[in-house]
Amino acid sequence: MPLTRYQSRNEYGLADPDLYQAADKDDPEALLEGVAMAGLVGILRQLGDLAEFAAEMFHDLHEEVMATASRSHGLMARVQQLEAEFPSIEKALLCQTDHSPFFSNKGVEWHPNLQLEQSVVTSGDLPRCVMDSYEECRGPPRLFLLDKFDISGAGACLKRYTDPSFVRLETSSYEESWDDIQREKKSQKAKRRASQWRNGGTPENALSSHAKLHELFLEEHLEAHHSDPARVVKLKTRKLDGCSLISKSGESYMEKFVQTRVDSKISYEIITQNPGLLTWNMDSARDVVTDIPEISMVGAMDKSHGGSRAEVSFPSEQENVANVNMNGGFIEKDIETVPESTYNEVRGTTITQDSQTVLNGKPGFFQQRSYSEDLTSEADNYVDAPATMESETETDDECRPKSRSDTLKDGNHHIYSDAVEERMEDPPQFSFSHSNGNTPVSENGRSSFGKKSTSYSYSDTASISIDDQSDGEKLSGCLPSTSSFKSELVDSMSHVTPEANKVSHDLNVQESVSSSNVDGQTSLSSNGTCSSPRPVSQNDQSCSLTVQSLASEVVETSPELVRLDLMKGGNDGRKVDPFDSSKSCASFDAKNSDLPSETSSISSTSEGSRCDSTIEKNCMVASNLVNSGTSPQAFVDSQTGKQLPIADTDFETNSIVACSEVLANSGSDPEERDGRCLTGKLVPCSAGVGMEVSPDTPSKVCGPSSADGIHLKDTLDDETDCVSVTNVVVDVDSKNSVADVGSQSSVADIDSQSSVAEISDEHSCAFGNTADVSVSESHEDTLENGMSVPSDFNSGVEKLAGDASPTCSKCDDHISHEGFHDLSGLDNATTDIVPNVELDVSDNDNDTSSGGVNHAVSLSSTRGKGSLPWISTNTYQSSSDAGEIFHDTVVESDGTLLEDNNPESEIKMHKSPLEVSSEGLSTEPDNKDVESIESTSPKPSLDQRNRDTETKSPGESILDDNCIDSTQVYNLNLLESEAIDQAVREQTSYASHEVADEELLQSNVFRGLEFEPQSAGLEFAPQSAGIELNRPKQELNLDPTFPSFGFIPETIPPNPEDMPPLPPMQWLIGKVPHSFPTFMGESVETSSSALSAAPPIGSSLNVQIGSPPSELSVSLGSDESERLPGGFVHNASEKPLQSSIQFPTMSTDLNSQYDSSELPTIPYQECIEDFGSEENNLLADHAAQNHELVYSQASSLQLPQVKHEDFKDDADVHESQSSSDDHHCPETKSLTPTQSTKVEDKGHSVPDASNAETAESSNTSVQKINPVSVGDAMWPVSCFSVAPTLDTYKTEVVPTVRLPRPRSPLVDAVAAHDRRKMKKVSEMVHPPIKSKQDDKDSLLAQIRNKSVNLKPAVTTRPSIQTGPRTDLRVAAILEKANTIRMAMAGSDEDEDSDSWSDS
């Protein structure tokens, strides 16, 4: 009841508080009256609520009573009805004599036709709750509307679609049909057995009981495996020439049928990871088998390590049996369907395919080959997948020729394409591309090559495709196998650990097995990494997939990693575990471990002339193999199957490439870190071999290179992956220019791996082949540039090979251990070489390759120091690479290179970019550089970019060391002028290059200038060279920035090792180092050239680019400008080069350059701080030494110098940042160049009017660079301001930024960035903002006026309401209270009033 709830409350609390609150508290009477009134009102309210509640309750009770009464009346009526009806029912029941119907009838039939309602007691058929749901539901489908269209008339449709009898009828008919089928099947089989016996059965061996037993087994088998008769295929019986139950071997049928294992005589060719059904297309309709499940040998690969030759014996299909090797080895595999076939061993052909092998372009399927000898077709034997196994076994035993068993016995799978059979057609259709045991990844765990026999299932029809009945020569497309066998492990190379094999997994398994390459090349069906989705062998030429002789089917594994099963590898009988995993090409090496990396080289060189894609791939593979192999290498003639000895020197480059490729293969599979191990093994040979690619060899490679590029492209959709790996190896393994063929952006991606990634874009560079091809292209480019690339390259590379071979080997091993993607893990020098100096490592090869691609620069920058100068002349990238390489080498070598001061090298550099580069390659620094690289390589902590920078550093530092000791300024000037000239020449030559002209120009200018400045920078900064080694390119940039090393040494920044790495300035600035990745491989090299040329810095490089060589030199002005570019250009060049590539047409606007410089200037506060102290001194000294003549350019250069000095102090941090952003310290360098550019632009445009245009044009390039540099540049604002102070007073403002240098570089960078943007935006936006502001102000004023007008009313109203309302209410209440009191008082009014008043 409500009262209970309200009792706890004050009675008057229920009433309006105004009733008593208004009373005067000082007047007790008034207060009491108010409280009394409130209490009464509350009580009345409670009573009213209670009355309402009671009314509702009684109403509900009334309704319930009425409902109960109604139901009771209904019950009474029903009871009465029952009483009336029951007697009749009772009578009927009692009258029945047989009560059995009660137990059998369905319920109402026994009633005497008396229909009663279901619910006798309740009124409805269903409970109300259920009826409600029915009422709410929709009605039945209005099928009656269709009755007019039905012949049966009204209600037919509803009945037809709701009658369950229809379903029952269908089921019964189905069962009947099933029974009929079973009966027919049994009778047919019995007849067939009898006919076979009649046709020549030998009763002594095969008894009638055997036939009966077989029939029973078969029936049970079918019943067990086929519950659905509709799926059972009825086969037509045909008479065979021999006893069906007795095979020629003399064993009874039951013997074989009961055996769980089959003798070596019986083997099954195909195993698919996908146990999908194979449809055989046979000419004869009677032979057609609709569905034939293939035998799945998926497990074999994994367990194949142990066996000799693994052959799958065929037990009954229903049981998954460990296949017994023909040789006694066993492979545990599930045999889902075992089409029996003989293997025709084709020596030297690797038909092997991993689970990834795809037939007819269909992954996971191997075409099955029917017996080609006595068995015209096994199709008749297949009733079903399960039935097929059994019947096939039976027929195999019965009809299988001895020769088939014999072929299997020898342990080699031989597929006989005997024409004896009528059904020759069928075998081709079913020809298998490989047998697991024979696959390079053999089921035994040994490559088929190791077995000496390549089981190449060769049938008259080479077509792998099931449907394709054409000749085997035809690859029905690359049959990429989606599934990958674990047999890759089987393919484990002797050099590769099982893990590596596993790692190589599908990609490696993908190795394309071409039995005989059309070119007779190494069966390098696929590159180490054929990551492209399409199989390498899509084009017969493109891959060795096309098997010339027995290559009826070259089963290519998925493009991930087509592995080359050397046709010859098997023929030698060597147990070569193809580097199925980490190196597809490695498989060749693994196979011929004795074949050094040169094998691939041989393929490319010897076979290269063929220019077949196979060659390219073979070359690539050979490279991988070569890497795995020892220095001596042999080329395997695919056709002859003989190994061709090849000079180590000839294949040094190739072997390195191969090594690189092997690394690429191992690295190409990102998952395949184990490949590192493989690669490491492969690499050693390359260490011995300096990846020396003679011009001839490169030319050969180049010849096939074009074809290779195409084929590789086809072959490698994911070339980048493969290429990347190759590049890494190439760079590391040798001064291989392989990587450069690809686009620069590839290099950026692959930079961590190596420039080789670029090959992927170019596609001309396959893996190992890519290296060769790239080298070839590089040589051509070098020649184009007028360089003696071949001789220099060969000699330089050889020297490098000799000098740096330990480093290469180290790098290669490191790479192999690290995995392709772990290039960062590689020795810093090597790694640096690989990503940025990949071509650099390649020495001249790389440079040569650079012609083909901007990354030729990377190729150019060789690990060998001597190579570097040589490279610089090869192409724009060559010279730049040379400088860059030296620069990087300096960075990488760090102290080591600095220790190696070779004036000769510097002089060479000064001589001319071409001369210097060629000489430099062969200069003393090679050994030291190698050492430096090796010593530097221990700096894997640096980003790959850093490593690249470091790698380049060593080369660069060679120059630095040499140049620093020798005339610093003079050499710098010489180098600058020569580099400028070369840059101009390179610009011209590269303008026509496929690479963007501007991009090339920038890189050329960078390279040329960089080369000069490199020597200059080297000259000035022995210390900075050391610093640079520590922080790749940054220190060197600082040194070149400063006029002379003498002054710079004071401000030598601590070694990067000593300094904590700073985050990339780009990060601080918030810019993405987009250009870095692309140019890491090239850009770093470019950076080295950038260092030598001042393009990134601004007008120096710009002038060089835009101006003739002489003008460029003038614009550079003095050694300072030269050095400054050397230091700055390296960083700027990396980024600017990328930038230039990215922004081919950049306005040479001084403002934009200024902005770019300014932005980079802001990034490093530390630089600013150091800059403040050292910058002024250094700049002053620098300005003093470097002539005021070039003060505009020089000052801009000086500015970066000062920044560099700051960076020297902050170099390590800066280097880390730049290395993280770039692969090297490009950020630092970029920053340096950027600021330099900024200052230079201003100074250059002001002081060098003659070079203004040139500077402008170069600024255009530089700006292209600058966007990157800006993002990457980490120059502190103070640094930038210093430069303006020296060069021009435009940047006087920067000192202000320097003041806040305590702030983080990020803040400065943001401030500078914002400031620059604000300037632009402020000019454009201010007027509109003002107008908008005015509009807003006017609107606001109007609104305010309106609101002010409205406010008074609002305020007045509330004030008025409060007082009077209360008074009125109180008065009214009092009046009412008085009235009530008066009424209650009645006759006692007077007394009451007295009492009230008294109280």
From Swiss-Prot:
Binds BRK1, actin, ABIL1 and ARPC3 (Arp2/3 complex). Interacts with SPK1, ABI1, ABI2 and ABI4. It is found in: Cytoplasm, Cytoskeleton. Residues 597-608 have a biased composition (Low complexity). Activates the Arp2/3 complex and binds actin through the C-terminal VCA (verprolin homology/cofilin homology/acidic) domain consisting of a WH2 domain followed by an Arp2/3-binding acidic motif (A), separated by a conserved linker region (C). Binds BRK1 through the N-terminal Scar homology domain (SHD). GO terms for molecular function: actin binding. Involved in regulation of actin and microtubule organization. Part of a WAVE complex that activates the Arp2/3 complex. Regulates trichome branch positioning and expansion. GO terms for cellular component: cytoplasm; cytoskeleton; SCAR complex. Residues 178-205, 371-456, 502-542, 568-611, 896-961, 1102-1139, 1207-1261 are annotated as: Disordered. Belongs to the SCAR/WAVE family. Expressed in expanding cotyledons, expanding leaves and expanding siliques containing developing embryos. Lower expression, sometimes not detected, in unopened flower buds and in matures leaves. Keywords: Actin-binding, Cytoplasm, Cytoskeleton. Residues 398-426, 568-580, 942-953, 1207-1227 have a biased composition (Basic and acidic residues). Residues 430-456, 507-542, 1102-1118, 1251-1261 have a biased composition (Polar residues). The gene is SCAR2. InterPro entries: SCAR/WAVE_fam, WH2_dom. One of its GO terms (biological process) is actin nucleation. Its main location: cytoplasm. It comes from the Eukaryota. Residues 1335-1353 form the WH2 domain. This is Protein SCAR2. The keyword Cytoplasm applies.
